[in-house]
Swiss-Prot record:
GO terms for biological process: regulation of DNA-templated transcription. Pfam families: zf-C2H2 (PF00096). The lineage of its organism: Eukaryota, Metazoa, Chordata, Craniata, Vertebrata. It is found in: Nucleus. InterPro entries: KRAB, KRAB_dom_sf, Znf_C2H2-type, Znf_C2H2_sf, Znf_C2H2_type. The keyword Plastid does not apply. May be involved in transcriptional regulation. This is Zinc finger protein 492. PROSITE patterns: KRAB, ZINC_FINGER_C2H2_1, ZINC_FINGER_C2H2_2. Keywords: DNA-binding, Metal-binding, Nucleus, Repeat, Transcription, Transcription regulation, Zinc, Zinc-finger. A zinc finger (C2H2-type) spans 141-163, 169-191, 197-219, 225-247, 253-275, 281-303, 309-331, 337-359, 365-387, 393-415, 421-443, 449-471, 477-499. Belongs to the krueppel C2H2-type zinc-finger protein family. GO terms for cellular component: nucleus. The keyword Isomerase does not apply.
């Protein structure tokens, strides 16, 4: 108690020295008031009272009766203090009991301190001061690192861990550490699957109250946080802060492993798992593992087939709202993300980020089999299937398999004959938006992909990639039949026809066939009777 008082004096909270402290300084035995167990529940309320006086029991009961032991000078067998609180500002104590108790105690024994807003019994003098601070809002404890102030020393100690990086609270299940016990408790729900906070509107459950609060805004449709730069609105201030970095280009979160920077701390955390190779989130249905819980949630929809988000324009449905938002830009033609280097615009910020690597020449993801590097992890995953021969996406119509889901989607249009993407310049239609984009370059003559080594330019990035192999001598596509290698997969496919005997072109008017692509045009003219 004496030490607490000295600390309070040091930070400038206590102005005068109580008689009790004088008694302690002189080495005299202080009086002792025992705290008895809580009895039945008459009305008592002040949440602060419960926390300060009986911390453990106070959490369980808001309404309590306080029984203090009999004092020698007091005539009654037990002295009761009944407390009635209607609100924080109105906390009344029976005046006779208050005065009676003070008369029964000596000056040094006085345990009742009068608060500015209400009267309260404290088991420590320091608690009286701490309680007063809560009402005044005084913040006497300042962080030397960032100047942030706190009203409690314990709060400052907790805050300091942000700067020191100390994380004393560790999860026994996975070893992840936290700087607060509350964060560890929340984290444990990932392992237990406990989601105590449920939305009354749609039944969706969450493991954090803050997540439920944020979720509820979806049902109201409110977006109070608006970007001054582009007018886009958000339902969370944090989302607006993150969005603003698109305009500023700020990326404060940097990976120590590869130097890559991110605009969000969560994206950096997810990225780090790539280096660690860790995939803690496993699908119970098929056993597939993921590095992020959100990716697992998205994956599960494959098994359920649920698609909640429908496009009003064309009726196409999506499993994620973000996918629908991106899809709508096909109809609107909106491309809000523009490259400052070459002026090219994109529908998605992630596509712009990937595009920028073309200019920077960045390729973080390397194939362990052939050492080929890629600017996107997804491209590396797809590339690996060349070596494994894996083709997980199969057409139900004809049985043809593909190593990309997008290839299967494109292939299916062959059966339907649908060509939704039309060129405004010449009227030619295509079954893919990417094919239309490539086609448009014919009219503009634009060649944005230039090789610095020889200065040659191309209208497609894939053509530039193939061209680079001429200089490097790289030939990653090898024929399993004869061992011959090529720098282009399409050339390998044509080469394979030599072994199978398949012909590339056979005119309807004659029985001759051609297996050389260079001779096809000549054959066509001969069959047509041209000279």
């Amino acid at each position: 108690m004496l030490e607490n008082y000295r600390n309070l004096v040091f930070v400038g909270i206590a102005a005068s020295k109580p008689d009790l402290i004088t008694c302690l300084e002189q080495g005299k035995e202080p009086w002792n008031v025992k705290r008895h167990e809580m009895v039945a529940e008459p009305p008592v309320v002040c949440s602060y009272f419960a926390r300060d006086l009986w911390p453990k029991q106070g959490k369980k009961n808001y309404f309590q009766k306080v029984i203090l032991r009999r004092y020698k000078k007091c005539g009654c067998e037990n002295l009761q203090l009944r407390k009635y609180c209607k609100s924080m500002d109105e906390c009344k104590v029976h005046k006779e009991c208050y005065n009676g108790l003070n008369q029964c105690l000596t000056t040094t024994q006085n345990k009742i301190f009068q608060c500015d807003k209400y009267v309260k019994v404290f088991h420590k003098f320091s608690n009286s001061n701490r309680h007063t601070i809560r009402h005044t809002g005084k913040k006497s404890f300042k962080c030397k690192e960032c100047e942030k102030s706190f009203c409690m020393l314990s709060h400052l100690a907790q805050h300091k861990r942000i700067h020191s990086g100390e994380k004393p609270y560790k999860c026994k299940e996975c070893g992840k550490a936290y700087n607060e016990t509350s964060n560890l408790s929340t984290h444990k729900r990932i392992h237990t699957g406990k989601k105590p906070y449920k939305c009354e509107e749609c039944g969706k459950a969450f493991n954090r109250l803050s997540h439920l609060t944020t979720h509820k805004i979806i049902h109201t449709g409110k977006k109070p946080y608006k970007c001054e730069e582009c007018g886009k609105a958000f339902n969370q201030s944090a989302n607006l802060t993150t969005h603003k970095r698109i305009h500023t280009g700020e990326k404060p979160y940097k990976c120590e492993e590869c130097g890559r920077a991110f605009s969000q701390s969560s994206t950096l955390t997810a990225h780090k798992i790539i280096h660690a190779g860790e995939k803690p989130y496993k699908c119970e249905e098929c056993g597939k593992a993921f590095s992020q819980s959100s990716t697992l949630t998205t994956h599960k929809i494959i098994h359920t087939g649920e698609k909640f988000y429908k496009c009003e324009e064309c009726g196409k449905a999506f499993s994620q709202l973000s996918h629908l938002t991106t899809h709508k830009r096909i109809h609107s033609g909106e491309k809000p993300y523009k490259c400052e280097e070459c002026g090219k615009a994109f529908k998605q910020s992630s596509t712009l980020t990937t595009h920028k690597r073309i200019h920077a020449g960045e390729k973080f993801y390397k194939c362990e089999v052939c050492s080929k590097a890629f600017s996107r992890f997804s491209h590396l995953t797809t590339h690996k299937r060349i070596h494994t021969g894996e083709k997980p996406y199969k057409c139900e119509e004809c049985g043809k398999a593909f190593n990309l889901s997008s290839q299967l989607t494109t292939h299916k249009i062959i059966h339907t004959g649908e060509k939704p993407y039309k060129c405004e310049e010449c009227g030619k239609a295509f079954n893919q938006s990417s094919t239309l984009s490539k086609h448009k370059v014919i009219h503009t003559g634009e060649k944005p992909y230039k090789y610095e080594e020889c200065g040659k330019a191309f209208n497609q990035s894939s053509h530039l990639t193939t061209h680079k192999m001429i200089h490097t001598g790289e030939k990653p596509y090898k024929c399993e039949e004869c061992g011959k290698a090529f720098n282009n997969s399409s050339i390998l496919n044509r080469h394979k026809m030599i072994h199978t005997g398949e012909k590339l072109y056979k005119p309807e008017s004659c029985n001759n066939a051609c297996d050389n692509i260079a001779k096809i045009s000549k054959y066509k003219r001969n069959c047509a009777g041209e000279k």
